[in-house]
């Protein structure tokens, strides 16, 4: 076999294998984007909601006058930070880009609440937490039941008990705030 025949053979083999290589490369790029639009939307919405809970939890620790509200805020910051970390890993594994900043809607909620303080903050924050957790439970239950991706469904299912616990705690804390009608500071810190 002459050099020119050998070169032609190599060129032909390379040319024939190029489409296969490109197809495999394209398939590997799209494998992470095979996430359904509803699963992707759930991840993004859950991430925004989680960031909101963390920000409002920090605000509650600073602005609330009732120690139970401060404690609730601390719990929200801790639990939602943990859930956010888990969600970030799933998003990264699935090729979903998450914003590191709150969107306008959630930023507006933070801005509105942080203008309040004391008993007024306590009442509004707890009202919002009850409402927010009811909505979160519906969304997470829907994802757990109807989600397409096993990892996203698992995250939703595993997070649901914590959200339900948060709702119960939010309702009891809101009742305490309503019934006290004023702040109840303890003398121990």
Positions of predicted regions on the chain:
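His/Met- and acidic-residue-enriched segments that coordinate or traffic transition-metal cofactors
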Residues: 2-189
């Amino acid at each position: 076999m002459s050099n020119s025949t050998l070169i032609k053979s190599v060129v032909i083999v390379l040319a024939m294998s190029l489409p296969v290589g490109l197809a495999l490369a394209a398939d590997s790029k799209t494998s992470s984007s095979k996430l359904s639009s509803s699963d992707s939307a759930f991840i993004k919405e859950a991430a925004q909601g989680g960031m909101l809970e963390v920000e409002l939890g920090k605000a509650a620790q600073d602005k609330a006058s009732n120690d139970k509200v401060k404690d609730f805020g601390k719990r929200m910051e801790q639990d939602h930070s943990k859930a956010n970390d888990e969600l970030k890993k799933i998003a990264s594994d699935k090729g979903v880009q998450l914003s590191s900043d709150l969107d306008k809607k959630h930023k507006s909620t933070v801005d509105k609440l942080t203008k309040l303080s004391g008993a007024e903050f306590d009442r509004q924050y707890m009202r919002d937490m009850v409402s927010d957790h009811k909505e979160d439970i519906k969304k997470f239950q829907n994802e757990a039941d109807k989600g397409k991706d096993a990892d996203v469904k698992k995250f939703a299912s595993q997070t649901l008990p914590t959200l339900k616990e948060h709702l119960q705690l939010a309702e009891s804390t809101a009742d305490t705030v309503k019934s006290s009608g004023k702040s109840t500071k303890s003398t121990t810190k």
